[in-house]
Amino acid sequence: MKHKGIVLKLTKSKAIISTNDFQCYYIKRSPTIYVGKEVEFTNKDIVTKKSVLIKPALSVACFILLIACVLSLSKIINNISPKVFAYISVDINPSFEIEIDDMGNVLNLLPLNDDAKVIADKLEIDKINVSNAIDIIINEAIKSNVINENEKDFILVSSTLNIKKEENSQQYQSEKEKLDIIINSLKDSIEKSGKADVYIVQADVNEREAARSKGISTGRYVLYNKYKDLENDLSLEDAKDADVNVLIKSMLDVASEERNPEESPKMTPTPTPTHTATHTPTDAPTPKPANTPTSTPAAKPSPKTASNSASTSTPAPKPTSTPTPTLMPTPTPTPTPADKIAYGQFMKFESSNYRGYYIRVKSFSGRIDPYVNPVEDSMFKIVPGLADPSCISFESKTYPGYYLKHENFRVILKKYEDTDLFREDATFRVVPGWADENMISFQSYNYPYRYIRHRDFELYIENIKTDLDRKDATFIGIKVD
């Protein structure tokens, strides 16, 4: 007859085994047996049998020993189990929440609605990277005709760091940067696959809890609040039930309409935050970069300008990896490049290596473009840095009260939030241009080794390493009325 039980204790030559029916047995000890191991044995292996009915005292001792072993094993398992580093919500129309560790590996997949439960039953995504997990989810959604691969529907992804929002905490900043890297990698992976477009939002643990209490995914909840910022009538139930692709595209359309006064004459600009006082224009300090590059950038001639005649165009260097635009604008006279940046004035910023391309906002994302329409999308009011008045912040002319800031290392435009983190993300130091000291570069306040640069025409904050990086991170400041 076969028996199965757990090893409770080892003696010199025997092992005490407890079975599920609370019987305790002594069997011969073998080299492979250890405390806590589940073993099978036969009557031939039993040295002495002690029934709980015959020896009540021994049965109690076995039971206590069993409980102690279970508790010890539970403690070991809990110590081994990795901590949830962050929560990633994915909305296609099925909605999921993925728990990840600090390496970006999946710990758990939680379906948030009935459609997600159907798909989740078909998936095996334990112990793989979150990028691969979401790719598997997208493939399953394509098979189920939830995503139209030919039209590249949007999917909504939110990231929530599993830590209280302590902006001044070094641990918070370190873990936030680690999560940003994971999310950037995830976004690049999805977009390179060509299966879908990605719209990414960030949330904190309080927003996640608020979303859970209202029975909505974190991503949809953040999107709902973005809609409220745009003064658009959207109920929470609509945000919960709407097709996520339609929801994102509608929000982007509303944002685009509100940015163009001609198309949306009823637009009312959001008031500038009360903390920002009107300043008499004064020269802003121009500190040196915190991390000086190891090699001095090759000197390039500064752009020639004329105060009384049309400006002379400067040939655009051809970048080695950034796509060369097929159409270059005809140079036109522009205001004189600013030697110094002063608070309170409006400015445009022209790329040093893509002449005629200006920093602008499109669908609340920062990028460089020629022929900006409306031109106000490329104009920014220079105000004292929200986190440090010796630095600067960029306030949108189209949207007063909205500022350029970095999020997941992308440069975006966002409505002012009264938090230290927002103020730091929206603050930049003006430093001599990486490619030409007569021009300017913008150093992130809270990531001092990263600078605003364009890549594939979109704006990021990144570390500057190559000659191309230096050129992409250098701009010409131009005063405008």
From Swiss-Prot:
Record topological domains on the Extracellular side: 72-481
Low complexity bias locations: 266-283, 291-315
Organism of origin: Acetivibrio thermocellus (strain ATCC 27405 / DSM 1237 / JCM 9322 / NBRC 103400 / NCIMB 10682 / NRRL B-4536 / VPI 7372) (Clostridium thermocellum)
Protein name, entry field: Anti-sigma-I factor RsgI5
Subunit text: Interacts (via RsgI N-terminal anti-sigma domain) with SigI5.
Highest classification ranks of the organism: Bacteria, Bacillati, Bacillota, Clostridia, Eubacteriales
Residue span(s) of domain RsgI N-terminal anti-sigma: 3-50
Extent of Pro residues compositional bias: 316-336
Region (Disordered): 255-339
